[in-house]
UniProtKB/Swiss-Prot annotation:
The protein's name in its UniProt record: Urease accessory protein UreE
One MF term in the entry's GO annotations: nickel cation binding
GO cellular component: cytoplasm
Name of encoding gene: ureE
Stored Gene3D superfamilies: Urease metallochaperone UreE, N-terminal domain, UreE, C-terminal domain
C-alpha cells in the first residue's frame, strides 16, 4: 500500500499534463480535513494518507506518494445547504449568525454554503434567507487567523482561538500598561500636592515636636491607602 504524505504548495505550478494524468482521490469535506485516513483512489487502489496535522485538502490539490507518484484531489458532491437572499443585508445577517456558531461556511459572491443541518436551515429561513438542500462540493473558508492552506473549523479552531487570544493579549496588554503607568503618574501628582491623606508609618522628626507650640495647623496621620 502506498503512503501519501506530501501536499504540493498551491503556488508551485506543475505541468498541466502531469496533473491531468495523475490518479484522482475523491473525498467529501469531512474526509478532506483528516490528516490520517485510509482511502481508496478512484482507480480502486487503496492508499494511506499521512499528512501534516491540520492539513485540509481542497479541490484540485496535488499530493505526492512515497514512491514519487502524484494524486489529484477532487471535492466530492455532498448534501449541503445553499443559502441566498433578496438583498446583501439579509445574506450578511445570515453569515453573521453562522459565524457566531462557528459553522464552517463557503462564501460566494451571492451565496453561502454549509453542511446540511435542519436546525440551521430553519434559523436561516426565519431571518429571510432562501435555503435549498442540494448536492454540491463543499469548500468552506479558512480560519480567520490560521491562514496558510488549512481549512475547516475542527482542525483550525484551536489554533485560531490561540492566535486570537494572543492578538487580544498584545493589544489589551499595551492598553493596560498605558493605563497603569498613567494611573501611577496621576496618583503621584496628587500625593505630592495633597495634605489630607494619611500614612501608616511614623516620621521621626528628631527634636521637632508637634504640639501647641509647633505652629502647624494640620496633622500628619499618614497612612497609604
Amino acid at each position: 500500500m502506498r503512503t501519501i504524505d506530501k501536499l504540493i504548495a498551491p503556488h508551485l505550478k506543475l505541468a498541466p499534463v502531469l496533473v491531468k494524468r495523475a490518479p484522482t482521490l475523491t473525498l467529501a469535506f469531512d474526509d478532506r480535513r483528516k490528516s490520517r485516513l485510509a482511502a481508496t483512489l478512484d482507480s480502486g487502489e487503496e492508499v494511506a494518507l499521512l499528512l501534516p496535522r491540520g492539513t485540509v485538502l481542497r479541490d484540485g490539490d496535488v499530493l505526492v506518494a512515497d514512491d514519487g507518484g502524484l494524486v489529484r484531489v477532487i471535492a466530492a458532491p455532498e448534501a449541503v445547504l445553499y443559502v441566498r437572499a433578496k438583498d446583501a443585508l439579509t445574506l450578511t445577517r445570515a453569515a453573521y449568525h453562522l459565524g457566531n456558531r462557528h459553522t464552517p461556511v463557503e462564501v460566494g459572491a451571492d451565496y453561502l454554503k454549509l453542511e446540511f443541518d435542519p436546525v440551521l436551515a430553519d434559523m436561516l429561513k426565519r431571518i429571510g434567507a432562501t435555503v435549498d438542500q442540494v448536492s454540491m462540493p463543499f469548500q468552506p473558508e479558512s480560519g480567520a487567523y490560521g491562514g496558510g492552506h488549512k481549512h475547516g473549523h475542527d482542525e483550525t479552531f484551536a489554533e485560531d482561538y490561540a492566535l486570537a487570544q494572543q492578538v487580544f493579549g498584545e493589544h489589551h496588554g499595551h492598553e493596560h500598561s498605558h493605563d497603569h503607568e498613567h494611573g501611577h503618574s496621576h496618583a503621584a501628582h496628587e500625593h505630592s500636592h495633597g495634605h489630607d491623606h494619611t500614612h501608616g508609618h511614623d516620621h521621626d522628626h528628631g527634636d521637632h515636636v508637634h504640639d501647641e507650640s509647633c505652629g502647624h495647623g494640620h496633622h500628619h496621620h499618614h497612612a497609604h491607602r
